[in-house]
Swiss-Prot record:
It is found in: Cell membrane. GO terms for cellular component: plasma membrane; proton-transporting ATP synthase complex. This is ATP synthase subunit delta. The gene is atpH. NCBIfam families: ATP_synt_delta (TIGR01145), PRK05758.2-4 (NF004403). Coiled coil: none annotated. F(1)F(0) ATP synthase produces ATP from ADP in the presence of a proton or sodium gradient. F-type ATPases consist of two structural domains, F(1) containing the extramembraneous catalytic core and F(0) containing the membrane proton channel, linked together by a central stalk and a peripheral stalk. During catalysis, ATP synthesis in the catalytic domain of F(1) is coupled via a rotary mechanism of the central stalk subunits to proton translocation. This protein is part of the stalk that links CF(0) to CF(1). It either transmits conformational changes from CF(0) to CF(1) or is implicated in proton conduction. It holds the Pfam family OSCP.
Amino acid sequence: MINVIANRYAEALFQLGEEENSTDVLFKELEKVVDMMTKVSKDFYKVLKSPLVSKSEKKNLVEIIFSKEVSSNIKNFLKVLVDKDRISYLEDIELAYKELLNKKNNVIDGVAISAIPMSETDIKELEVKLSNKYNKNVTIENVVDKTILGGVLVRIGNEQIDGTVKTRLDKMKEKLSEVIS
């Protein structure tokens, strides 16, 4: 579950995006910032979180690093997070913002776990079937997990559709155990 604080900041940024008709653009920029801080430049993220660095220095760093990378809205948003000591919530804010954007665009994200990588055709076919079932636009990310042996396990929200060989074998094993004992 996403943090209440992160939700509030995400809602504020989303509202700004709605007012300026730029919710998608703001999300792409927010995603870019989070990727940069969590994957590319972890040290920069540590500096922004550090209590040893003054807030004015942190805001100057944000201005310098992101001067050409993102809009002033995202830079100012980051500066507010720095001012309020909320920069550590950035990843949760991104997740909360994505949920708001998905809700606006009638999208549900799902995961299809399979033993081998699914083809693009299979993923698209699964997305179409699930979109029809849920009356929403379903986007699927394929994750490979060799422990499921075969088949597909689909997770969408709190729902799980289990079509894996492992589960079928486990059920057979259970039934055999009942018969034998």
